[in-house]
UniProtKB/Swiss-Prot annotation:
GO terms for molecular function: nickel cation binding; zinc ion binding. It holds the Pfam family HypA. Zn(2+) binds at C73, C76, C96, C99. One of its GO terms (biological process) is protein maturation. Ni(2+) binds at H2. Involved in the maturation of [NiFe] hydrogenases. Required for nickel insertion into the metal center of the hydrogenase. Keywords: Metal-binding, Nickel, Zinc. The keyword Glycosyltransferase does not apply. Belongs to the HypA/HybF family. InterPro entries: Hydgase_Ni_incorp_HypA/HybF_CS, HypA/HybF. Gene3D superfamilies: 3.30.2320.80. It comes from Methanobrevibacter smithii (strain ATCC 35061 / DSM 861 / OCM 144 / PS). This is Hydrogenase maturation factor HypA.
Length: 125
């Protein structure tokens, strides 16, 4: 259930950033979740919807994008997107789609990142 702590961290970062920029409201938050981050996007979305209540993020459009796993295979030289065998949610298997090698380098797809925040600021009258 680490989605709750992840959601809390995201909301704290968004609110801190918005407040440091004198925002009156957050209208959009873009989040990228790597397939290897072990975060369920639906659970994260639910946790976020609860945590934003009565904050400047409450009415924001929260966009969550899943990022594929990108690898580099030292065996055959493949560099690109790999499929993820996640039958076992806690220990997914990533292998080279070209040669089947499991000793690969992960280039992308492990992180959870707040990619963008759109805010409203008070009118300068």
């Amino acid at each position: 259930m680490h989605e709750l702590s992840m959601a809390q961290g995201i909301i704290n970062a968004v609110i801190d950033t918005a407040e440091s920029n004198n925002a009156t409201e957050v209208t959009e938050v873009g989040i990228e979740i790597g397939r290897l981050a072990m975060i369920n996007p639906e659970q994260l979305r639910f946790m976020l919807s609860v945590l934003v209540e009565n904050t400047i993020v409450e009415d924001a459009d929260i966009k969550i994008e899943e990022i594929p796993v990108e690898i580099n295979c030292p065996e055959c030289g493949f560099k690109g997107v790999a499929e993820l065998d996640d039958k076992d949610h806690y220990a997914p298997i990533v292998e080279c789609p070209k040669c089947g090698n499991k000793r690969i380098s992960i280039l992308n797809g492990k992180d959870c990142v707040v990619k963008n925040i759109v805010i409203e600021k008070p009118d300068d009258d």
